[in-house]
């Protein structure tokens, strides 16, 4: 059966699992919402669902400075208690997220933060490209949905493929960490700084250097 975007979004809101994980769960369970939740729980991807409503107001502002001081990242990750904020696993998660941001250069934490005008501009570009193919309107809209999801996966931190484990997204990594630690967590915001950004300088692929360092 065909799984709709509405079904995926509903399951995502209920469990906090990643979009692709939700789609797979619905596909495996024939579109049954409750069975899909159980499927995600067996995979350890929805263990955070019962914790999702709890306030995460403690946490840590972590940092990562790439070798040579050419790239720097600050990221705020929240948790429920100061006790967990001092936990080595939590602090390790924050460091890993900062390193990922340095390598992958997301622009937003989640898709809800992406300005509507930017989304519409991207849709217009994809729609025009699809029209040139001569495909039916219904097919074009399906292609458009796929292209926009790829767009979000490129620029939204939670939907990016984790640089240290290409088999999972940052959302999945977050869910697994929540399940392991036992508290709700949230990646609130981040900032990335590149030495000399905006100034005339010799070209150098700093992001590739960071990615290589992360993979070590």
Curated annotation (Swiss-Prot):
For this UniProt record, give its keywords in alphabetical order, as a comma-separated list.
Cytoplasm, Elongation factor, Protein biosynthesis
Location(s), subcellular: Cytoplasm
Q: Tell me, what is one Gene Ontology molecular-function annotation carried by this entry?
A: translation elongation factor activity
| Top-level taxonomic group | Bacteria
Region of interest called Involved in Mg(2+) ion dislocation from EF-Tu, as start-end residue ranges on this chain: 81-84
Q: Which InterPro entries match?
A: EF-Ts_dimer_sf, Transl_elong_EFTs/EF1B, Transl_elong_EFTs/EF1B_dimer, Transl_elong_Ts_CS, UBA-like_sf
Check the record and name the Pfam families matching this protein: EF_TS
Q: Kindly list the GO CC terms recorded for this protein.
A: cytoplasm
Protein family according to the UniProt entry: Belongs to the EF-Ts family.
Please explain the role this protein plays, according to its UniProt record.
Answer: Associates with the EF-Tu.GDP complex and induces the exchange of GDP to GTP. It remains bound to the aminoacyl-tRNA.EF-Tu.GTP complex up to the GTP hydrolysis stage on the ribosome.
Q: Cross-referenced NCBIfam families, in alphabetical order?
A: tsf
Q: What is this protein called?
A: Elongation factor Ts
Q: What is the lineage of its organism?
A: Bacteria, Pseudomonadati, Thermodesulfobacteriota, Desulfuromonadia, Geobacterales
């Amino acid at each position: 059966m065909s799984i709709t975007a509405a079904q995926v979004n509903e399951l995502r809101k209920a469990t906090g699992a990643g979009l692709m994980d939700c789609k797979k769960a619905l596909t495996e369970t024939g579109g049954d919402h409750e069975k899909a939740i159980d499927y995600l729980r067996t995979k350890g991807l929805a263990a955070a669902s019962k914790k999702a409503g709890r306030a995460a107001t403690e946490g840590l502002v972590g940092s990562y400075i790439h070798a040579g001081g050419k790239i720097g990242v600050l990221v705020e990750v929240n948790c429920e208690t100061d006790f967990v904020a001092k936990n080595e696993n939590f602090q390790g998660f924050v460091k890993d997220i900062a390193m990922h941001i340095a390598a992958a250069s997301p622009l937003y934490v989640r898709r809800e933060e992406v300005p509507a005008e930017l989304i519409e501009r991207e849709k217009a570009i994809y729609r025009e490209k699809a029209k040139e193919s001569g495909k039916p309107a219904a097919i074009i809209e399906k292609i458009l949905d796929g292209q926009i999801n790829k767009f979000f996966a490129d620029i939204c931190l939670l939907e990016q493929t984790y640089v240290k484990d290409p088999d999972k997204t940052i959302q999945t990594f977050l869910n697994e960490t929540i399940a392991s630690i036992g508290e709700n967590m949230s990646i609130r915001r981040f900032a990335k700084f590149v030495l000399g950004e905006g100034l005339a300088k010799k070209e150098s692929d700093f992001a590739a250097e960071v990615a290589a360092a992360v993979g070590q």
